[in-house]
Amino acid sequence: MSWLILLPLVFSASFVLTMVGLGGGLIFSPLFILLQFPVHTAVSASLFLNGVAALSAAITYFRKKMVDVKIGLPLIISSSLFAPLGAYTTSKVNLRLFTAILAAVILLAAARMIFSQKAESDTKEISTVHRIIGGGIIGMVIGFAAGLLGIGGGVFIVPLLIYVLKVPTRTAAATSIFIVVFSSFSGFMAHISIARPDWGFILLAALFSFAGGQLGSRVMAEKLKGRTIRRIFGAVLLVFALKLIQKVFL
């Protein structure tokens, strides 16, 4: 595939997914592998571009005061601690059954996000203690599931923040982006210790990823309502659930 096509795809993925609290990795990694990039190159490039898009969007969300750091920090810490536990447990559980259950839960969350007509208040208050404890517990769940399945945990953050902690959708998406910055770059550092990335490609692609993250975050912050964000994210969840189902049955 020509770079004239690939680089706009990087921009588009960053634009769409940063609006809903993700960085683009759901698209980058399978796209690069489909284009027959070496696996380590595909994964490291995906993580780096994911981090760049998330960092770009996080700048906007912090300026708009949309990030809830009191939830984000304990979530980052606890998910980092529990991801190795999930990886260690991989050989001790029935992964096919666990993945099937997870896919079913994600499908339900996707349906609720897409079809729910319930309005929300962007001014709903949550106690500081509730935020810290809830963020820590959610981080444990996300880290464990991510380590167990070998997938990024970002796709779980937004629905858990919305439906468990009752965080307004826009705040949940912005806080998720803040978390994705740390998880992406830490994963990238681990991968470059194994294999050298294609710096020429990822630095050029990073310009498009950064631009997409800027545009996506500005559109979300200034134009999109919570209900619209939930529906876009629900569509992303639906695609992710179908990928998990494919992993179970194929």
Model-derived features: positions:
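Early transmembrane hairpin of solute transport permeases
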Residues: 30, 34, 41-58
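Transmembrane helix-bundle signature of multi-pass membrane transporters/permeases
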Residues: 43-51, 80, 173-181, 206, ...
